[in-house]
Amino acid sequence: MMVYLDTSVMMRKLQREAGSLREWGQWERAYSSELLRVEVLRTIDRTRLRGALTDREVADLVEKARTIFDGLDLIEMTQSILNRASQSFLTPLGTLDALHLATALRLVESGGMDLTFLTHDTELATAARSLNFKVQGASGPA
């Protein structure tokens, strides 16, 4: 199985939160946008600045994140991805989610691959389903 994962999936895994994706790592190949690295590291730093993480916890999370990044194919944010993210989608979608979805669309269009979209975000899951992606990870009315 080929997958595209968004930041919500990686953050739940890193933080060992309830509801983490059970199928973690059970894929042939995993893709994400280079945006993932920025979002994950910013989230860790923001949490640190709020006093919710010790220095040791930050170091552990960053080390685990880098290990995960090394196992992913991170896709460059190209002009065509930015252009597609700027266009309308069938359902409401925020900017960062639109960038993730546009990246997954570019992978499918350029490589003819069948991707499963991994997200815990129900709004992003709905948008991905509206574009015929198989979606895993989102619960509730998506």
Where are each of the predicted segments found?
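Helix-adjacent hinge/juxtasegments
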Residues: G51-M77
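Short, well-structured N-terminal submotif of metal-dependent ribonuclease cores
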Residues: M1-R37, T47-A59, S139-P141
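Acidic, PIN/NYN-like endoribonuclease modules and their adjacent C-terminal/linker elements
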Residues: M2, S33, R106-A142
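Short beta-strand scaffold positions
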Residues: L5, S32, E76, T95-A98, ...
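A short glycine/serine-rich beta->alpha loop
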Residues: Q26-A30, Q87-L93
